[in-house]
Design a protein with these regions (language model features):
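Short glycine-aspartate micro-motif
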Residues: 3-7, 52-54, 109-113, 181
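Short beta-strand scaffold segments in enzyme catalytic cores
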Residues: 13-17, 59, 101, 118-123
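Glycine-rich phosphate-binding loop and adjoining helix at the ATP-binding site
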Residues: 29-42, 46-54, 59-108, 145-147, ...
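Glycine-rich beta-strand-to-loop/alpha-helix junction loops that act as flexible
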Residues: 53-59, 116, 177-186, 200-202
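Oxyanion-binding and handling regions
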Residues: 153, 159-162, 170, 186, ...
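Intrinsically disordered, polybasic Lys/Arg-rich low-complexity tracts
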Residues: 229, 233-234, 239-267
Length: 270
């Protein structure tokens, strides 16, 4: 069975079919309707063969159907007949859940997708649980306001990364995952990964779409198969957690008073 996986994002829609080695994409944005999305996806797929379709949808999905309109796209998605539009059986799943499914290994995994917005999914012993944390209150806004694209553009990379570390720390304490994956297009903009995290691979969204129909990594082309992490020791990463930043500020204040940093000797101490 050949599967067409469609990853719908706030900036682009990406597609890949089993047996193909190069994803294709087109621009999405606030004017993208589901009718236009299907038309563009079918046109872009061209001569690709597919028997079924998987759609990663940027919103709440219940029993395979969107139940809320996406925040970054046009309306009309709720109640839209995707199977009629594509002409083949279709499965719809939350976009973060689709990438999480492709990233999953075992146990309790938390997936956070850092893209235009914030995707969030827990998988516990194979059970996929989309979380929809993006628009929950966080500081003076929502999680998405601080760690989504708006937060990155407004705060700058360093402060944005600090909030990513803070969000991971909070969610890790609350959910107790034994595996944390940071995916999405902006994950690669992190200078370092928070402790206990591994980097996701955007190609895992396609793998998740294939897995929805029982297909696995054997259908992901070699140039897209995620590379296992190196076993070589890594250099110690700079700690950008909120606790570390607080300690640095206290150290700087102490340095101003004494004229030296902790552990630093002056000529009077020698």
């Amino acid at each position: 069975m050949d599967v067409l996986a469609v990853d719908v994002g706030g900036t682009h829609v990406k597609i890949l079919a089993t047996g193909q080695d190069q994803p294709r994409k087109f621009v999405s944005g606030s004017k993208l309707t589901p009718k236009r999305m299907v038309a563009e996806a079918r046109k872009l797929a061209g001569k690709w063969k597919y028997d079924v379709v998987s759609i990663g949808y940027p919103g709440v999905v219940t029993q395979g159907r969107p139940i809320s309109e996406p925040h970054n796209l046009a309306s009309g998605w709720v109640g839209f007949d995707f199977e009629k539009a594509f002409g083949v059986p279709v499965k719809v799943i939350n976009d973060a859940a689709m990438q999480a499914l492709g990233s999953y290994k075992k146990g309790r995994m938390l997936f956070l997708g850092l893209g235009t917005g914030l995707g969030s999914t827990m998988i516990v012993d194979g059970d996929v649980q989309p979380m929809e944390l993006a628009h929950l209150p966080y500081k003076r806004g929502t999680y998405e306001d601080y760690v989504g694209l708006r937060g990155l553009e407004r705060l700058g990379r360093r402060k944005w990364q600090r909030h990513v570390f803070d969000v991971v720390d909070r969610l890790s304490a609350a959910l107790e995952p034994n595996d944390i994956v940071l995916g999405g297009g902006n994950a690669k903009k992190l200078k370092d990964l928070p402790p206990g995290c591994r980097a996701g691979n955007n190609a895992n969204a396609f793998l998740g779409g294939f897995r929805l129909w029982g297909d696995g990594v054997e259908h992901l082309p070699g140039n897209l198969v995620p590379t296992p992490p190196s076993s070589a020791p890594e250099a110690e990463a700079e700690d950008l957690s909120p606790q570390s930043e607080k300690k640095k500020k206290q150290s700087r204040k102490k340095t101003k008073k004494t004229g030296k940093a902790k552990g630093e000797q002056t000529w009077q101490d020698a």
